[in-house]
Amino acid sequence: MTAFTRDGTPVAMEGGGLDFRKREAGGGMSVAFIPLPEGTDLAPALKGLDGDLCQCPHWGYVFKGRIRMRTATGEEVYEAGQAYYWGPGHAPEALEDVDVVEFSPTAEFDAVIDHVKAQAGG
């Protein structure tokens, strides 16, 4: 059994108010601590992925704020106090400062992170 903290988790991406931390949790899954500043829209960074959307599933919990999740069929807003499952094919936008923790399949998550970093030039 394992436990993780935000401070003990390595930074995967940072800049512009983003301090995205991720580590392998075991069983082919990773845990991520993700604060997103209000107005952060990941759609531009997802361009080039299938459907221009994140294709990695995520299970998580919103600790703070509100986040809009856009899909090919519409959108839904999630807010503090809600647990979620986001299936493949989504693009998040922070409507307020957001703080989430989520669990995702490592291989799929790493592919999306690598793509986002490449889009950002890093």
Label every model-predicted segment.
Residues 43-45, 79-81, 111-114:
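A short, polar/proline- and glycine-enriched secondary-structure boundary/capping micro-motif
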Residues 29, 88-113:
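Ligand-binding loop in jelly-roll beta-barrel domains
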Residues 20-22, 31-33, 59, 75, ...:
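Conserved hydrophobic/aromatic beta-strand scaffold that supports enzyme active sites
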Residues 39, 75-77, 107-109:
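Short, surface-exposed beta-strand-loop junctions and turns on beta-sheet-rich folds
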Residues 52-69:
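Short, conserved beta-strand element in jelly-roll/cupin
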Residues 1-43, 50-51, 117, 122:
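A short, N-terminal "cap"/entry segment at the start of jelly-roll beta-barrel domains
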Residues 26-27, 70-74, 95-97:
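Short strand-coil-strand connectors
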Residues 71-90:
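Short acidic-glycine-tyrosine-enriched beta hairpin
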